[in-house]
């Protein structure tokens, strides 16, 4: 085995881990929804879509055996994580500033009309308001945790893209 193969194998293992982390985060969201009765708002559902996209791209990238394919999927992961950062930051700003709204009247029908909301309504149907502040976990609101998660994923994937940029030429 050469360094190229070892690096690709290590990268694929990390991508598998990222995929499983996304599954765990989505399972945590379902736990909060069904056990703690914390209904998801439109921005919560959009964040779930971003975590799903990151997980799917991570699992697909873990199955690819060349750097170019891994690079393309890691780029898609970075784009999804950046979208998640923006959505979570907006959600957090709404919760930190009472009186603001996420535009439930306009956002809810759009989110609920997406195909996954029809296929998996228990996971992707809007049931709450963005202004509803649920009890913080370790002093941080839920959108804050999502923001931290998306930011960590974004930084890690961008660092990986930067670190392995020379392997694309090979």
Curated annotation (Swiss-Prot):
GO molecular function: electron transfer activity; protein-disulfide reductase activity
GO cellular component: plasma membrane
Topology, Periplasmic side: 32-49, 90-144
Organism superkingdom: Bacteria
Cytoplasmic side: 1-14, 65-71, 164-170
Keywords, in A-Z order: Cell inner membrane, Cell membrane, Chaperone, Disulfide bond, Electron transport, Membrane, Oxidoreductase, Redox-active center, Transmembrane, Transmembrane helix, Transport
Function of the protein: Required for disulfide bond formation in some periplasmic proteins. Acts by oxidizing the DsbA protein.
Protein name stated in the entry: Disulfide bond formation protein B
